[in-house]
């Protein structure tokens, strides 16, 4: 785990009752971009995610994100590679003015049932700046060498 610099913005966190005893989001290494989020399911329950199905997993956390920032919810690569478990709506955006519980929308793209247990690391949260540009409607935009080419137009090799 790493310590934030004194000039870093503060991410306020309320831990709800069903998340008591779970670790708060934390950076696992000095170079980590994302903090792991944990499943706040009841101790005596688990969520069984069937192949091809999706579910909303509670984290038991409410975030107070400073204006000018967002928190992005992203998949954990190990869950995706080993089990076919990933986040839908990726990256999910938690806006600075949202004050509800953070939940993670997971889908099982694997072949087997997947059990989500209390405290399991289910996703990553990435704290990121937000820039809101001025919107200006135009009749024309500048030309580029690429033009309107997309979806493989630059090749696949």
From Swiss-Prot:
Highest rank taxon of the organism: Bacteria
Top enzyme category: hydrolase
EC number: 3.6.1.23
One Pfam family cited in the UniProt record for this chain: dUTPase
GO molecular function (one): magnesium ion binding
Function of the molecule: This enzyme is involved in nucleotide metabolism: it produces dUMP, the immediate precursor of thymidine nucleotides and it decreases the intracellular concentration of dUTP so that uracil cannot be incorporated into DNA.
Name of the molecule in the record: Deoxyuridine 5'-triphosphate nucleotidohydrolase
Gene name linked to the record: dut
């Amino acid at each position: 785990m790493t310590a934030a610099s004194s000039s870093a913005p503060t991410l306020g966190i309320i831990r709800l009752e069903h998340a008591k005893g779970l670790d708060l989001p934390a950076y696992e290494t000095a170079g980590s971009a994302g903090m792991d989020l944990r499943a706040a399911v009841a101790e005596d329950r688990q969520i069984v995610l069937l192949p091809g199905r999706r579910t909303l997993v509670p984290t038991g956390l409410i975030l107070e994100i400073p204006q000018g920032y967002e928190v992005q919810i992203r998949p954990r690569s190990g869950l995706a590679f080993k089990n076919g478990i990933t986040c839908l709506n990726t990256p999910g955006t938690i806006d600075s003015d949202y004050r509800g519980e953070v939940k993670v929308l997971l889908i099982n793209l694997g072949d087997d049932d997947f059990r989500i247990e209390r405290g399991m690391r289910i996703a990553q949260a990435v704290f990121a700046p937000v820039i809101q540009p001025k919107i200006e409607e135009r009749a024309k935009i500048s030309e580029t060498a690429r033009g309107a080419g997309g979806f493989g137009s630059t090749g696949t090799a």
